[in-house]
């Protein structure tokens, strides 16, 4: 757009001064985006991984986060319902980081908890967003603190070790999902 003088034309139409823009930072960022010198593999462990657009904001944030590090981000899509103790090493053994995004309902949560445990035990960087952060707390309570049935009240109202509770202002709010969401 700069080559087409769009900014200059717009400024003239609006009777504004149009100083010459300094695009050096922009050009540097575009160069970094187009010419990364490394690849970082991130496992995105969720329950909606068949629908990549469900996580579009997370994907774009990862891509943009790679730019200043001169890195391209390779996302390994992991269905949390399919992740289990028999395949966790094979599925997550080749990643540089694990991200568990938000979600709703109980479906796939045990796979997310397993991913959080794998990250902790193997010293792999982990980022939990919303439900992803909650499952990391559940994992820690179960496997480090020894509260074997630790859970979120939202997901298991009968747990004897509730490590995630509903906020008081959420009490009585109808759930917008079912347990298999």
Where are these regions (language model features)?
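C-terminal lobe/tail of nucleotide-utilizing enzymes
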Residues: 1-60, 65, 70-90, 164-170
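Generic recognition of cysteine residues
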Residues: 11-13, 18, 130, 145, ...
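Flexible gly/pro-rich beta->alpha loop and the following alpha-helix that scaffold active-site loops
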Residues: 59, 63-133, 138-151, 155
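C-terminal, non-catalytic macromolecule-binding modules
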Residues: 150-176
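Conserved small/polar residues in nucleotide/adenosyl-binding loops
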Residues: 177-181
């Amino acid at each position: 757009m700069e080559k087409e003088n769009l900014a200059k034309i717009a400024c003239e139409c609006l009777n504004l001064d149009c100083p010459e823009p300094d695009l050096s930072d922009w050009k540097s960022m575009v160069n970094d985006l187009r010419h990364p010198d490394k690849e970082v593999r991130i496992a995105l462990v969720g329950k909606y991984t068949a629908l990549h657009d469900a996580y579009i904001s997370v994907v774009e944030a990862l891509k943009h986060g790679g730019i200043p590090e001169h890195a391209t981000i390779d996302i390994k899509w992991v269905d949390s319902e399919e992740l289990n103790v028999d395949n966790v090493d094979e599925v997550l053994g080749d990643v540089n980081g694990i991200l568990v995004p938000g979600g709703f309902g109980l479906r796939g949560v045990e796979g997310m908890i397993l991913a959080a445990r794998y990250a902790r035990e193997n010293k792999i960087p982990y980022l939990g967003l919303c439900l992803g952060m909650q499952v990391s707390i559940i994992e820690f309570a179960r496997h480090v603190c020894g509260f074997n049935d630790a859970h979120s009240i939202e997901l298991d109202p009968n747990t004897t070790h509730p490590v995630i509770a509903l906020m008081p202002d959420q009490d009585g709010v109808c759930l917008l999902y079912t347990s298999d969401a």
